[in-house]
Amino acid sequence: MGKTKAFNDTFLKACKGEKTDHVPAWYMRQAGRSQPEYRALKEKYGLFEITHQPELCAYVTRLPVEQYGVDAAILYKDIMTPLPAIGVDVEIKNGIGPVIDSPIRTKADIERLGELHPEEDLPYVLDTIQLLTKEQLNVPLIGFAGAPFTMASYMIEGGPSKNYHKTKALMYSEPETWMLLMNKLADMTITYIRAQVKAGVSAFQIFDSWVGALNAADYRTFIKPVMQRIFTELKSENVPMIMYGVGASHLVKDWHDLPLDVVGLDWRMSVDEARKEGLTKTLQGNLDPTILLSPWEVIEERAKDILDQGMKSDHFIFNLGHGVFPDVSPDTLKKLTDFIHDYSAKHKKSSI
């Protein structure tokens, strides 16, 4: 029997701003699309089968840890996973994304939404987490959920949108109906994350992919109170809490106000700029994923710049500003991870 690897808690330490031997790294969408092993799996099984069979899902979740040497695993699931359980039928269509044939657009639609019971509705999610825990994954496992605004935008628009005009129209014209939906989705998020933590995740990230469509004033009025409730109620779970959104640099100070541990940055705002804005909590990010399609010299230069900014504090985790593209080479991600670890370890050693 092979020797069990020691548990790597670098990511968890960085979430709290504790000293580490190197900067921890993991990548959004690190599991799946860019890996040949995953593509081979997709030739045998559909996405539904992979995500609903704990053994397959655990395998996909584990792959980047074994191949790239990242400091955390993130559960391989979709943010849409809990919606069918509350009465919203979702189909993931190739080349489009989540599609909802019966959008949620009225108060009556919202009132018909049910409650989430993870043990009954999503046993395959919890079984996957427990399987990874039993297999002694040697890095923390990150759970996640979609934020109420992003979930609502899919539910109201019926799928991806460029301008979210139906979503924003409901928010502006029927604020009470909007808040009813926000609170129902907040309840779902809290219940879902609690179940994931109970099953064994060591941290979680809330993805608000499309919240950048709102200005700061509207965010504070229509979204922030709900996010405050989510993080306040989940604080008792005693695991690091991460917030991330796309194109939302104008909202990071509002995120920083929330009782969370880590603020995720996309590539539009540098780490230095975020610190100048007064963000003292742990920052996570923020290499533009497109750069991973460039020559290695370019990747190294950009990664070094981000590390130099991030390492001014122990409150830093290296990630991308968005998810890994399908055409990124796994070798590039391995090389990047090694560079992050080696470069940051030398810096930290020399600064002792």
Swiss-Prot record:
It is an enzyme of class 4 (lyase). GO terms for cellular component: cytosol. Its EC number is 4.1.1.37. Pfam families: URO-D (PF01208). Substrate binds at residues 29-33, 48, 78, 154, 209, 322. One of its GO terms (molecular function) is uroporphyrinogen decarboxylase activity. Keywords: Cytoplasm, Decarboxylase, Lyase, Porphyrin biosynthesis. The record marks 78 as: Transition state stabilizer. It catalyses: uroporphyrinogen III + 4 H(+) = coproporphyrinogen III + 4 CO2. It comes from the Bacteria. Pathway: Porphyrin-containing compound metabolism; protoporphyrin-IX biosynthesis; coproporphyrinogen-III from 5-aminolevulinate: step 4/4. PROSITE patterns: UROD_1, UROD_2. Its main location: cytoplasm. GO terms for biological process: protoporphyrinogen IX biosynthetic process. CDD domains: URO-D (cd00717). It is found in: Cytoplasm. Catalyzes the decarboxylation of four acetate groups of uroporphyrinogen-III to yield coproporphyrinogen-III. Belongs to the uroporphyrinogen decarboxylase family. Homodimer. This is Uroporphyrinogen decarboxylase. It comes from Bacillus pumilus (strain SAFR-032). The gene is hemE.
